Amino acid sequence: VVLVISEIFGVHEYIADVTRRFAKAGYLAIAPELFVRQGDPSMYGEIAKLQAEIISKVPDAQVMADLDAALKWAGKNGGNTNRAAITGFCWGGRITWLYAEHNPKIKAGVAWYGRMEGQTNANNPKHPIELAASLKAPVLGLYGGADTGIPVTSVNNMKEALAQAANKGNKAAKASEFVLYPDAPHAFHADYRTSYRAAPATD
């Protein structure tokens, strides 16, 4: 089973296509609509407004519960939940880190340029860097060195947090890795945007 977590734009054609690619490779792949209670991202043309009116109102706890439900559904519909993984892009990259700490059934995660640190609030009480010590599945972090929203220093901070967790015996933290593509911007996997970079996206 592979859970595919969208960017802030929701499950649009790009995310559907990524999910189909996993399905064609033989996985039961699911891309849940995680913003449905707050609104429809496809109705927004302005990112700042989308962020303010929908994304900021989505609690991490709600997302974790929805993903638990999606995984449970997969188990009842032919999926092997003993071999479950998660991958996500941008907003979904952050969720990938969180879910790899939340659910012990997850065996691996791949986080594409997901935020790892920042200000906390009631809906986002902890970021990945604060959860490194209790990570339950190894995560492969794929990040761009030219990402203006997630600086290389943030990647290095997360590496350090994972190293400290590994030194204290956390096997998932020890097995986690990063690949930093020096010239890649944010959203380098998004093949419908000008940020797309074929080499790191297909590496």
Label each PLM-derived region with a short phrase.
Residues 30-31, 111, 141:
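Hydrophobic residues in well-ordered beta-strands that form the structural core
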Residues 18, 128, 151-164, 177:
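Short alpha-helix in the alpha/beta-hydrolase fold that links the catalytic acid
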Residues 27, 34, 114, 181-183:
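Active-site loop/turn elements of alpha/beta-hydrolase fold enzymes
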Residues 165-203:
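C-terminal catalytic histidine-bearing segment of alpha/beta-hydrolase fold enzymes
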Residues 1-79, 127, 188-193:
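Serine-hydrolase catalytic machinery in alpha/beta-hydrolase-like enzymes
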